[in-house]
C-alpha cells in the first residue's frame, strides 16, 4: 500500500540500494557457500556461476566503425583531460526558450560563502555573439571533495533565457582559467522535433576491479573510463548523424557513471569525478542538452547534483542526497523525470498529478525512470522491480501517460501497449535470488552470453522450482495487454502505456535477456553492442526507431503511436508537418519517398473531401504517419561511387569469396583470406535479405549463432580496407544458402 511506503521510506530506500548492487556479487556468495559446504565433506568443489557480463572494448568498436584514428587521438588526449573536473553539462530548460548549464571551477577562496570571483557565462547569436547576455553563476560548494593536488571546487549553474527557435547561438564560460573558446548551440523547432533516448552510459563500468586505494585500481578505472567514454561519444555521434544534427536533446534513463560512493576507496566522493569527466567529455555534449535520470549508481553521491542543472526540480521523490523528481516541456510534450531510487510512491504520485495538472496543454506525456519495470533482462523479474511496477502503473494510467522510458538492465526491450497490470503473487527477494542462481547457472568456466540459460524446467518436482515458475507466470501480465487498432507499425488512439527499456549506450556492461520472454514484450534485443533510439514527435504521432551504434542498423521495427479524433483537424496538421519533407525529397531513397508522396497525395484528397467518413480520415492519417516513419535517408557515402582522395583512388578491394557450414542452430562462414582490414557478413532468413543482420570481423572464420533450426540462412560477404579512418568496401560475394541444423 502507498501508506505503508511512507512509514517504511528509509528502510525501503536502503533495501533498494542493496538490491540493485546484488547482481555483481550474487554469484560470488553462492560460490563461497558451495565451497564451504563441499570442503566440510572433503569433496572437491565445482565452481559454476552465471555467465559473465559482456562489455565492448573501444578499440574493437573503433575497428568496426572505421574510427581507429579517432581512438588513437583520444587515448593521448585522455591523459591530459582525465584530471580536468571543469567540463560543462547542458540540460533542457523548463521549456524550449531556456537552456541550463552546470560546471565546476576551482575555489578562489576557502570561504564557502564567499562570492568573490563568481564565474559568468556569456551567450549570444551567431559567431559574433550578437545581442549577448551575461549571466552570473549561482554557486554551490562541492562538499567533501578535493582533487589529487588538494584543490577544492565550486559548482556553478546558469539558466539562459529568451532563446529563439531555429537559431544558432555561441556561448563561453569562465572555467577558472579564463573564458573558454565559444561553443555552438542551435535551437530546434518545437512543432516537430526529435530526441534521442539512451540507457546506462555507466562510464567506468568496464573496470572489473573493486574500489581499493591502490594504483592498480586507479589505473584500471582510468582505462575503463577512457574506453567507455569513447564508446559513449560514438553513440552520440551516431545519433546526431542519423538525424542530420536535428536532435533537440537526449533523455538518459540513469546511471551516468559506475562507482557509487559506498564502493569508492575510503568512500571518498571525489574518486568518481574521473568518471564524470569521461561522461562529459564527448564533443557532442557541448551542443546537445541531456535530461538525466537518477540511477542506482548515481544515487548516493551528491556530485550528481553538482554536475547537472535540472529544471523545475522538486523535493518530492528525493532520497535526500541527489534531489527528487523534475520535469520540462518541449513543444507539445511533457517530460516527467522520476527519481525512483526514492521508493515513496505517494510522493511520485503527488508530483505527477501536480505536474500534469499544471501542463494540461501538452498532448504527449512521457515519463522516465531508471528501473525497467516492464523490461526483459536479468533485473526485470526481481520482486523489488515488480513491486515498484504494480504501484506505479496505476498512477501512469490515471494520468494518461503515453510512454515510460527506462534503463537499468542494459538490454533493449519494447512492451506491447499495457493497461491494468495487477500483482498476483507474493514472492520474496531471498526466494527469488536462490532460484535465479540455479536457473541461470552457466556451468564451469562460463563464457559471455546474450540470453541466460533456463535450467529450471516446467516439469520439475522441486516445490521451490514450481513456486519460482508460478511467480514468473504471474508477472507476465498477459491480461494487461491492450487490444489496439493497428495500421502497419502504428497503434491508433491506445488507452494503454508503452514501456521501453534502453540497452547500454556505451557498452560498458551488458546483461543477459531472461530465458523466458515475458508475454508483455513485443520485441527485445541483446547482442552486446551499444544502442540508441531516436524518437520523433509531431502533433499527432510519436515514432520510435532504435539502432545499434556500430553499423546504424535498426534492431526493431519502426513503432508509432498515433492520436486522432477522426476529424480533419489532426489530418491537416500532419499534412502541414509533412510539407517540409517535400522540400528535402532528394535526401531520401526513391522508393521510400514514392510511398510517402502517394500517402501525402491521398491524405490531401481525403482532407479536401467534405464527405469523407471518420474511418477514411483516420486511415489516411495512419497511412501518412507510417509513410513518414518509413522514409529512408540516402547514404551519405556510397562505397562504389564515393568521391575519393588521391590516396583512396588507388585502393582496390577484391570481391570476397566464402563457404558455409551448417551446425546446430548456427552457421559457420569461412572466408577466403585477402589482404584487407576486415570483412562484413550480411545474413537473413530470406533471399531478399529483408530484416538482414550485419556482422563485422577481422577473422576469416566467423560463426553466426542463435539461429532457428531447419530454417534457411542466406549469407553474403564483402571485404573492406580502412584508409584514413574510412572504410572502402569491395563487392559482395554471391549469395550463399544453407539449412540450419
Regions found by a protein language model. Give the residues of each.
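Pro/Thr/Ser/Gly-rich low-complexity, intrinsically disordered linker/stalk tracts
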Residues: 75-99, 642-675, 727-741
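Extended active-site neighborhood of metal-dependent phosphoesterases/phosphodiesterases
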Residues: 154-160, 165-187, 210, 215-222, ...
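Extracellular low-complexity, O-glycosylation-prone stalks/linkers
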Residues: 117-129, 675-694
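Beta-strand-rich modules
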Residues: 166-167, 704-725
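Short beta-strand segments within Ig-like beta-sandwich modules, predominantly Fibronectin type-III
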Residues: 148-152, 693-698
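Sec-dependent signal peptide cleavage junction
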Residues: 40-59
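Divalent metal-dependent phosphoesterase catalytic cores across multiple superfamilies
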Residues: 60-293, 299-321, 350-354, 385-399
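Beta-rich interaction/scaffold domains
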Residues: 565-644
Amino acid at each position: 500500500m502507498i501508506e505503508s511506503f511512507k512509514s517504511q521510506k528509509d528502510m525501503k530506500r536502503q533495501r533498494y540500494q542493496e538490491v540493485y548492487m546484488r547482481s555483481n556479487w550474487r554469484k560470488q556468495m553462492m560460490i563461497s557457500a558451495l565451497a564451504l559446504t563441499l570442503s566440510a565433506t572433503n569433496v572437491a568443489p565445482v565452481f559454476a556461476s552465471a555467465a559473465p557480463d559482456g562489455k565492448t572494448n573501444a578499440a574493437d568498436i573503433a575497428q568496426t566503425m572505421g574510427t581507429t584514428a579517432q581512438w588513437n587521438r583520444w587515448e593521448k588526449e585522455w591523459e591530459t583531460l582525465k584530471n580536468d573536473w571543469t567540463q560543462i553539462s547542458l540540460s533542457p530548460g523548463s521549456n524550449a526558450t531556456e537552456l541550463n548549464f552546470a560546471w565546476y571551477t576551482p575555489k578562489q577562496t576557502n570561504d564557502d560563502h564567499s562570492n568573490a570571483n563568481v564565474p559568468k557565462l556569456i551567450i549570444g547569436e551567431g559567431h559574433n555573439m550578437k545581442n549577448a547576455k551575461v549571466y552570473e553563476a549561482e554557486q554551490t560548494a562541492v562538499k567533501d571533495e578535493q582533487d589529487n593536488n588538494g584543490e577544492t571546487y565550486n559548482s556553478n549553474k546558469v539558466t539562459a533565457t529568451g532563446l529563439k527557435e531555429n537559431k544558432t547561438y555561441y556561448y563561453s564560460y569562465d572555467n577558472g582559467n579564463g573564458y573558454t573558446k565559444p561553443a555552438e548551440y542551435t535551437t530546434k523547432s518545437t512543432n516537430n522535433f526529435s530526441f534521442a533516448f539512451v540507457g546506462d552510459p555507466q562510464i567506468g563500468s568496464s573496470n572489473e576491479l573493486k574500489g581499493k586505494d591502490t594504483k592498480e585500481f586507479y589505473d584500471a578505472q582510468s582505462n575503463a573510463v577512457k574506453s567507455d567514454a569513447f564508446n559513449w561519444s560514438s553513440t552520440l555521434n551516431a545519433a546526431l548523424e542519423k538525424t542530420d544534427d536535428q536532435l533537440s536533446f537526449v533523455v538518459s534513463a540513469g546511471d551516468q557513471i559506475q562507482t557509487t560512493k559506498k564502493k569508492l576507496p575510503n568512500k571518498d566522493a571525489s574518486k568518481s569525478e574521473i568518471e564524470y569527466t569521461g561522461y562529459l567529455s564527448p564533443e557532442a555534449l557541448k551542443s546537445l542538452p541531456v535530461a538525466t535520470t537518477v540511477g542506482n549508481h548515481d544515487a548516493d553521491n551528491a556530485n550528481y547534483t553538482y554536475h547537472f542543472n535540472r529544471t523545475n526540480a522538486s523535493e518530492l521523490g528525493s532520497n535526500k542526497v541527489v534531489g527528487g523528481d523534475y520535469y520540462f516541456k518541449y513543444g507539445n510534450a511533457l517530460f516527467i523525470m522520476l527519481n525512483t531510487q526514492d521508493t515513496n510512491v505517494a510522493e511520485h504520485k503527488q508530483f505527477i498529478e501536480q505536474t500534469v495538472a499544471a501542463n494540461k496543454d501538452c498532448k504527449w506525456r512521457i515519463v522516465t525512470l531508471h528501473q525497467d519495470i516492464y523490461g526483459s533482462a536479468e533485473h526485470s523479474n526481481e520482486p523489488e522491480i515488480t513491486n515498484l511496477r504494480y504501484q506505479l502503473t496505476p498512477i501512469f494510467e490515471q494520468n494518461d501517460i503515453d510512454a515510460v522510458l527506462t534503463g537499468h538492465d542494459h538490454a533493449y526491450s519494447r512492451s506491447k501497449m499495457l493497461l491494468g497490470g495487477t500483482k498476483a503473487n507474493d514472492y520474496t527477494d531471498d526466494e527469488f535470488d536462490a532460484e535465479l542462481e540455479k536457473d541461470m547457472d552457466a556451468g564451469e568456466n562460463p563464457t559471455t552470453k546474450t540470453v541466460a540459460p533456463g535450467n529450471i524446467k516446467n516439469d520439475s518436482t522441486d516445490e521451490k522450482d514450481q513456486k519460482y515458475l508460478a511467480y514468473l507466470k504471474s508477472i507476465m501480465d498477459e491480461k494487461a495487454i491492450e487490444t489496439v487498432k493497428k495500421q502497419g507499425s502504428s497503434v491508433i488512439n491506445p488507452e494503454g502505456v508503452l514501456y521501453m527499456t534502453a540497452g547500454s549506450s556505451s557498452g560498458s556492461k551488458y546483461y543477459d535477456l531472461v530465458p523466458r520472454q515475458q508475454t508483455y514484450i513485443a520485441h527485445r534485443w541483446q547482442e552486446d553492442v551499444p544502442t540508441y533510439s531516436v524518437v520523433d514527435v509531431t502533433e499527432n504521432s510519436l515514432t520510435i526507431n532504435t539502432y545499434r551504434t556500430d553499423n546504424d542498423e535498426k534492431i526493431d521495427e519502426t513503432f508509432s503511436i498515433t492520436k486522432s479524433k477522426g476529424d480533419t483537424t489532426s489530418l491537416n496538421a500532419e499534412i502541414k508537418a509533412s510539407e517540409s519533407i517535400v522540400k528535402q525529397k532528394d535526401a531520401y531513397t526513391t522508393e521510400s519517398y514514392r510511398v510517402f508522396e502517394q500517402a501525402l497525395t491521398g491524405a490531401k484528397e481525403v482532407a479536401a473531401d467534405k464527405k469523407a467518413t471518420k474511418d477514411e480520415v483516420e486511415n489516411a492519417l495512419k497511412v501518412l504517419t507510417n509513410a513518414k516513419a518509413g522514409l529512408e535517408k540516402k547514404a551519405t557515402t556510397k562505397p562504389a561511387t564515393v568521391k575519393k582522395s588521391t590516396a583512396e583512388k588507388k585502393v582496390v578491394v577484391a570481391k570476397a569469396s566464402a563457404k558455409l557450414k551448417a551446425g546446430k542452430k548456427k552457421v559457420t562462414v569461412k572466408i577466403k583470406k585477402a589482404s584487407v582490414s576486415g570483412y562484413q557478413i550480411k545474413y537473413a532468413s530470406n533471399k531478399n535479405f529483408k530484416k538482414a543482420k550485419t556482422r563485422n570481423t577481422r577473422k576469416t572464420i566467423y560463426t553466426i549463432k542463435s539461429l532457428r533450426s531447419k530454417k534457411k540462412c542466406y549469407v553474403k560477404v564483402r571485404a573492406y580496407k580502412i584508409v584514413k579512418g574510412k572504410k572502402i568496401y569491395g563487392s559482395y560475394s554471391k549469395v550463399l544458402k544453407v539449412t540450419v541444423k
